[in-house]
Regions:
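Metallocofactor- and cofactor-centric catalytic cores in central/energy metabolism, strongly enriched
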Residues: 2-3, 10-14, 23-26, 33-34, ...
Length: 179
């Protein structure tokens, strides 16, 4: 495993498009019968799936600084990608955020979670920031988060912290054999 240096760390990123517009697009792309059929087709046709994933990466990288984690948290973070946080924190800021909202690692940049708060508040989705996110499944890195979303691989990605009965699944729902 390559040890990240300051040059290779993720850098906080301010998205280019309004959160309100992104919530609208996300609503249009929610899982439905057609999207699931498209996802299944993309998974069966390797080259088409690779082209779709490359297009998704190009768009989301420019728009959000996307790191292609395969488990997109954008709808729960005001469309500010938590993977652009140098510490890749998915459930809120670290303790090093300065009073003016600067990132601890890159002080010349705004903390991605400050940006997420401002964007969620401006678009009326502040409650989304209280959703707890399960740890990222690194096996999905580089895969299409849209295909994963349409195929239901993101189910249980977020949980309401007030529901103490909610258990965040870390492992896939398929049974694992005992070691």
């Amino acid at each position: 495993m390559q040890v990240p240096t300051k040059a290779t760390w993720p850098r906080p990123y301010v998205p280019r498009l309004s959160a309100r517009l992104n919530y609208l697009v996300h609503h249009l792309l929610t899982p439905n019968r057609v999207n699931r059929m498209v996802a299944r087709w993309l998974e069966r046709h390797r080259r088409a799936g690779q082209a779709f994933t490359a297009a998704e990466k190009a768009v989301k990288e420019r728009a959000f600084g996307c790191r292609m984690c395969g488990q997109c948290a954008l709808p729960a973070t005001g469309y500010a990608c938590p993977q652009t946080c140098p510490k890749q924190l998915r459930n809120g800021p670290c303790g090093g955020v300065s009073p003016d909202g600067a990132c601890e690692v890159f002080p010349e940049m705004r903390c991605v979670w400050v940006v997420a708060y401002e964007r969620a508040e401006a678009s009326g989705h502040l409650d989304d920031l209280s959703l707890l996110q399960r740890p990222i499944d690194h096996r999905l890195a580089g895969s299409s988060s849209w295909v994963n979303y349409w195929q239901g691989r993101d189910e249980g990605l977020w949980a309401d912290p007030d529901d103490v009965r909610t258990r965040l699944p870390i492992w896939p729902t398929t049974t694992r054999s005992a070691a």
